[in-house]
């Protein structure tokens, strides 16, 4: 998922099957229950999720591939199981999701290099 974002479910109406997810950027995006990736068609308010944003009906932005209990790697963008900023390891690039390094991009911590350097190095590997 290249445009993966993180957020939390702000509201969900089981009867109608519609909900809102608040993205990390502060915007609220609507979604339909068929976009919940575990197939349950229901989700609790407050659940941390990853999702992608696509143009939906009538040109409105909609959340798709709403995935509960996951986090988006700040280095490579891949979606991983687990909680965000809980020192989980990315299965794609090996980044340890350190909350301090997420806030202070040039700091080292759980990872030997900073988030800024890791992103630069990851982009360089893709360019080859």
Regions found by a protein language model. Name each.
Residues 73-76, 90-93:
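Short cysteine-rich clusters marking metal-coordination/redox-active sites
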Residues 54-69:
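OB-fold/S1-family single-stranded nucleic acid-binding modules
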Residues 15-21:
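Short aromatic-glycine-enriched beta-strand elements
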Residues 80-81, 94-97:
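Cys/His-rich microdomains that often coordinate metals
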Residues 37-50:
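Short nucleic-acid-contacting surface segments enriched for D/E, G, S/T with interspersed K/R
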Residues 2-14:
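Structural detector for short beta-strands of small beta-barrel domains
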Residues 70-71, 87:
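Residues immediately within or flanking Cys/His clusters that coordinate Zn2+
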Residues 103-128:
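Short, intrinsically disordered terminal segments enriched in charged and Pro/Gly residues
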């Amino acid at each position: 998922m290249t445009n993966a974002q993180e957020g939390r479910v702000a509201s969900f109406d089981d009867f109608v099957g519609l909900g809102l997810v608040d993205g990390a950027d502060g915007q609220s995006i609507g979604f339909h229950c068929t976009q919940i990736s575990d197939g349950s068609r229901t989700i609790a308010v407050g659940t941390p999720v990853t999702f992608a944003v696509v143009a939906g009906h009538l040109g409105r932005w909609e959340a798709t591939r709403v995935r509960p209990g996951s986090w988006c790697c700040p280095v490579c963008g891949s979606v991983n199981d687990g909680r965000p900023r809980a020192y989980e390891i990315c299965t794609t690039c090996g980044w340890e999701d350190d909350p301090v390094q997420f806030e202070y991009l040039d700091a080292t911590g759980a990872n030997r290099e900073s988030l800024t350097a890791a992103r630069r190095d990851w982009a360089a590997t893709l360019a080859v």
